[in-house]
């Protein structure tokens, strides 16, 4: 990193931190705590406060039917409470959100190491960091102290240390990510492919043993802290059966609101198995391009997640520009970007009309969620198709100016 670029990055991180810190201490933070686009049943800050209140009064934080998050987040908020209360909590969350921008920069730099011929990427890492840090989908969850922002941070750390070939730190970050959100286990195999490309001497069994060691350490530490093992049941259950039907940006809540109980188990299985169906085929087909497929699967994970928020969209949409040569071959970027923005704005209006004004209903709000899912799924498919095109032309440079046609 050249000195001038270091100063620019430091200035960018400082601007992002102070902007978020200022907004976190205004009425905007209180407003965002209750916005379903930012706060979900498994990431909302108010639910953490409820769990913390139960814990401080000698009760099991998972006994109230409100707190479903990882005990790691409870420990973090409890330590912040001891150090100075809500102001320290906001400072910590803002710092973590800003540090995510640093790891985005480092990942963009490592992308060039993984792609020495610059077949996929020629974009400046600093610009990728700008896109991430100044994206409202990124800093609004940081202002709202959302747990999804911490999940994004650990996910970025996992990808970065995998791209560095540091298997012990990678396994630790992967354990942290899975402990916060068990669904993140879907990223284990594609992120392992990144590690394998950078350090071919590492075996999967070796990584898995270290991963289990760190995960066991987190479970034991949480058990001592809570004096209970209820955290092994309650948080996992809410991800598996989605019994909290609070409206969110996802597809599950409305579907299971209307579903007869006789069919609930079957469709829970369908929703759970759907993301798994894409992981192995995509990873096997493009095993030699592990970083772009990991980012694509992050987008897929946010599409089928039980309780998604705008924070889940931010990490996928902000990392895509790393592969600017792939984006140049994406045909539907304008359509998909407009669909995502349109759905987010329309969804906020429909939710306000439904809940606040009482002149709408859930059907209108869920329709905006379907538009969001359609735009996101089309963007993922467009990215994967463009990735295959760029890869094919790189291996067949003599056909560079010959357009490919679909076989009828």
Swiss-Prot record:
InterPro entries associated with the record: PIG-U
Residue numbers spanned by region May be involved in recognition of long-chain fatty acids in GPI: 247-267
Any one GO cellular component localisation term in the record: GPI-anchor transamidase complex
Keyword terms of this UniProt record: Endoplasmic reticulum, GPI-anchor biosynthesis, Membrane, Transmembrane, Transmembrane helix
Transmembrane segments: 9-29, 66-86, 88-108, 125-145, 149-169, 207-227, 266-286, 303-323, 339-359, 370-390
A single BP term in Gene Ontology: GPI anchor biosynthetic process
Pfam families from the UniProt entry: PIG-U
Annotated pathway: Glycolipid biosynthesis; glycosylphosphatidylinositol-anchor biosynthesis
Cellular location(s): Endoplasmic reticulum membrane
Record's bilayer topology term: Multi-pass membrane protein
Primary role: Component of the GPI transamidase complex. May be involved in the recognition of either the GPI attachment signal or the lipid portion of GPI.
Similarity comment: Belongs to the PIGU family.
Subunit structure: Forms a complex with PIG-S homolog, PIG-T homolog and GPI8.
Name of the molecule in the record: GPI transamidase component GAB1 homolog
Organism: Schizosaccharomyces pombe (strain 972 / ATCC 24843)
């Amino acid at each position: 990193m050249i000195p001038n670029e270091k100063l620019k990055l430091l200035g960018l991180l400082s601007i992002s931190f102070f902007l978020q810190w200022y907004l976190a201490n205004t009425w905007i933070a209180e407003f965002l705590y209750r916005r379903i686009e930012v706060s979900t049943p498994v990431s909302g800050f108010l639910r953490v406060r409820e769990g913390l209140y139960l814990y401080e009064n000698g009760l099991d934080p998972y006994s109230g039917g409100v707190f479903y998050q990882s005990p790691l987040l409870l420990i973090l908020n409890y330590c912040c409470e001891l150090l100075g209360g809500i102001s320290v909590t906001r400072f910590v969350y803002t710092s973590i959100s800003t540090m995510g921008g640093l790891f985005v920069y480092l990942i963009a730099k490592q992308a060039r190491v993984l792609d020495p011929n610059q077949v996929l990427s020629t974009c400046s890492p600093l610009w990728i960091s700008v896109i991430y840090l100044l994206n409202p989908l990124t800093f609004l969850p940081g202002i709202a102290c959302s747990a999804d922002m911490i999940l994004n941070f650990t996910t970025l750390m996992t990808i970065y240390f995998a791209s560095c070939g540091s298997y012990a730190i990678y396994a630790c970050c992967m354990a942290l990510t899975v402990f916060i959100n068990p669904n993140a286990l879907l990223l284990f195999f594609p992120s392992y492919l990144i590690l394998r490309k950078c350090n071919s001497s590492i075996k999967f069994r070796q990584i898995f043993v270290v991963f289990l060691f760190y995960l066991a350490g987190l479970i034991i530490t949480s058990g001592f802290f809570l004096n209970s093992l209820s955290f092994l049941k309650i948080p996992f259950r809410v991800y598996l059966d989605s019994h909290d039907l609070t409206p969110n940006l996802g597809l599950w809540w409305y579907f299971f609101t209307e579903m007869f109980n006789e069919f609930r188990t079957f469709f829970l299985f369908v929703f759970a198995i759907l993301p798994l169906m894409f992981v192995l085929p995509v990873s096997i087909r493009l095993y030699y391009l592990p970083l772009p497929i990991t980012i694509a699967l992050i987008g897929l994970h946010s599409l089928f997640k039980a309780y998604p928020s705008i924070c889940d969209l931010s990490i996928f949409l902000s990392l895509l520009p790393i592969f600017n040569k792939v984006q140049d071959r994406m045909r539907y970027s304008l359509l998909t970007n407009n669909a995502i923005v349109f759905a987010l704005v329309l969804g906020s209006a429909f939710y306000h009309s439904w809940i606040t004004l009482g002149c709408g209903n859930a059907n209108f709000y869920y329709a905006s969620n379907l538009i969001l899912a359609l735009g996101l799924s089309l963007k993922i498919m467009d990215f994967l198709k463009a990735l295959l095109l760029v890869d094919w032309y790189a291996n067949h440079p003599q056909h560079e100016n010959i357009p490919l046609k679909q076989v009828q």
